[in-house]
Curated annotation (Swiss-Prot):
Superkingdom field: Bacteria
The protein, known as: UPF0181 protein ESA_01442
Similarity-based family: Belongs to the UPF0181 family.
InterPro entries referenced in this protein's UniProt entry, alphabetically: UPF0181
Pfam families: UPF0181 (PF03701)
Organism of provenance: Cronobacter sakazakii (strain ATCC BAA-894) (Enterobacter sakazakii)
Taxonomic lineage of the native organism: Bacteria, Pseudomonadati, Pseudomonadota, Gammaproteobacteria, Enterobacterales
Amino acid sequence: MFAGLPSLTHEQQQQAVERIQELMSQGMSSGEAIAQVAQEIRATHQGDRIVARFEDDEEE
């Protein structure tokens, strides 16, 4: 699977981590917090995007 992902600076990545930790401290699960922050980044990010390939590691 290929996806256009926002290209974030180290500072932006750190801000995302801090936001996730803040949401978790308010009682949100880690999965929900990550999903919410990812959605926020996609909605507000302006800048370059990277192309990433995700492979399924599980053998069927």
